[in-house]
């Protein structure tokens, strides 16, 4: 297949592109700085800054574009950047798809379990209604834009992704804290943490590219979510480091502001559709996932 990945220079995009390249697919990666990314990346692919630079028909599109939610405070200006980098960019992508003589067969669009907001103890399958906080509203608007691809006759899947454990994202800074003897939970760590190993995220996306019966939202989270304190205690055990710092949640608010919601929202997601599909999990539990990732590094 000829597969277009937008946001192809990020942690997830690069991991997916590497796997798809090894499987023999033809790749086009969209980035704001294609020349720089082409020099950095070892993946054989065409890099483009403009969608109109793509000259060959595309069979599948994986949309992973979007500014980082955590790096900067959520000022009104930053919220606009976060919104536009997802909704407006996805709208432009759909406009490009609509103008193709041969539209893609499948469209996988980024999303997040933040769709559900803070669900407490409730199990969130793909049928669960969306939350009301700002991150949830952002994800819901992103999905609402993406599903319009169905009007083009394109099978559309929404990748409701949990925190991905791998060489990027949440895990590396956590490991540094633990290795420095500063590891700990957040408050009591009682909130649910719906994680996924990068290998399973890539494997699930590959399965969704070819499984023609699946459409709509799909939870990309491991089948065994844990409370956050179990995640940190397991990480400490794997790294042979103590887990003793547990700053109260109220202490995070002055530093992180609204971004605290990203860290402490309780989301107990269940990958109902992936399980029904018969997806074989490489790392279904947090102990095996962290052991693998810490051993690799």
Model-derived regions, located:
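C-terminal amphipathic/interface module of NAD(P)-dependent oxidoreductases
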Residues: 261-297
């Amino acid at each position: 297949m000829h597969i277009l990945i937008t946001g192809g220079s990020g942690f997830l995009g690069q991991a997916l592109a590497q796997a798809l390249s090894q499987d023999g697919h033809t790749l086009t990666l969209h980035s704001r700085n294609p020349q720089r990314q082409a020099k950095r990346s070892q993946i054989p692919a065409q890099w483009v800054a403009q969608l109109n630079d793509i000259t060959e028909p595309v069979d599948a599109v994986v949309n992973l574009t979007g500014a980082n939610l955590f790096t900067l405070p959520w000022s009104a200006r930053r919220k606009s950047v976060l919104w536009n980098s997802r909704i407006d960019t996805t709208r432009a992508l759909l406009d490009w798809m609509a103008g193709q003589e041969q539209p893609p067969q499948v469209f996988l669009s980024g999303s997040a379990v933040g769709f559900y907001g803070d669900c407490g103890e409730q199990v969130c399958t793909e049928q669960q209604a969306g939350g009301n906080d700002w991150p949830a509203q952002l994800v819901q608007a992103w999905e609402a834009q993406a599903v319009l691809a169905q009007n083009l006759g394109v099978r559309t899947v929404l990748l409701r992704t949990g925190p991905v454990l791998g060489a990027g994202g949440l895990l590396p800074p956590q490991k540094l804290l633990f290795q420095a003897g500063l590891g700990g939970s957040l408050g009591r760590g009682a909130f649910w943490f719906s994680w996924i190993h990068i290998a399973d995220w890539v494997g699930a996306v590959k399965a969704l590219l070819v499984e023609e019966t699946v459409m709509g939202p799909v939870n990309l989270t491991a089948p065994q979510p844990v409370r956050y304190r179990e995640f940190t205690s397991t990480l400490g055990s794997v790294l042979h480091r103590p887990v003793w710092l547990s700053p109260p949640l109220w202490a995070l608010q002055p530093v992180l502001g609204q971004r605290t919601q990203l860290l402490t929202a309780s989301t107990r997601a269940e990958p109902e559709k992936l399980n029904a599909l018969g997806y074989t999990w490489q790392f279904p539990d947090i102990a095996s996932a962290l052991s693998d990732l810490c051993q690799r590094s």
